[in-house]
Amino acid sequence: MAKYILSCCSTADLSKEHFDKIDVKYICFHYELDGVEHPDDLGQTMPFEEFYRKMTEGAATKTSQVNSDEYYDFWKPYLEQGSDILHLTLSSGISGSVNSANIAREDLEEEFPDRKLYVVDSLGASSGYGLIMDTLAGMRDEGRSIDELHDWIEQHKLDLNHWFFSTDLTFYIRGGRISKTAGTVGTILGICPLLNMDDEGRLIPRSKIRGKKKVIQEIVKRMEENAQDGLDYSGKCYISQSACMEDAEAVARLVEERFPKLDGKVEINYIGTTIGSHTGPGTVALFFWGKRRQG
């Protein structure tokens, strides 16, 4: 079987140590903080705590996706050494990264006609996207071929459920996703929006929950309703959080209590600087395998 590598973007929001452990390569998005560009490199250049503190203090943020030249330079050495590549991009519902990746893929396929270079739109984000990569790495380690992985993930990527809530509406207002009036009222009333990712990889508001305790209960209820095998779910569960570890840990405890057959403890990661530039602090995201996503 031909050797191959798995790769993704840094927006899969796993730690560098996790990516190294499962041998998945990643390419970095970019973000600006008060006009200064930084790589979204999993908190290595700027610790996540510092990033979110600066956002809270009013720093302006802006993000940029990986361009086609960067993809080209990232993949070419692996093709030169004789490896095939399966790359998953951040969801096309929130980023145009897949288009840049496909431009680079077409150029490289002309240069390396004997190599396979698959580009797949993950339709996922943050550590949900990361859980997909972790699952594929496990399949690779079992001896499955690149073609088997490609076909499997195209069939099953919508089975990876993404649920999010936020307890801080500041950056939703600043980014125009919530009107200033609605945001002000929501803040006064303690409203926490509950969102999920649909079958086109877009973030869709589903409910407005009053109070942190209630929204924590509600997001776990959504897992109960949608997880593969219900309360007998035996897969992995990941959580991402943006400078609200206590809330993330509260969700994790509840998940571990309700789902005793989980594959290991719930893994909690930071929401990285690209996605975090849009959510700001106060967001918790829950990821698990389950019912196929709908619109």
Residue ranges, per PLM feature:
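Positions that flank functional sites
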Residues: 34, 93, 201
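Glycine-rich phosphate- or other oxyanion-binding loops that anchor nucleotides, phosphorylated ligands
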Residues: 56-92, 99, 103, 150
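Short beta-strand->loop
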Residues: 89-91, 120-123
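Short beta-strand/turn micro-motifs composed of small residues
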Residues: 8, 89, 241
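Alpha-helix N-cap/helix-start motif at coil-to-helix transitions, marked by capping-box chemistry
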Residues: 42-45, 95, 126-127
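A short glycine/small-residue-enriched secondary-structure motif
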Residues: 45-52, 75, 80, 107
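Mixed-charge interfacial surface used for oligomerization/domain docking
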Residues: 3, 11-19, 24-30, 97, ...
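N-terminal glycine-rich anion-binding loop in soluble enzyme alpha/beta folds
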Residues: 5-65, 70
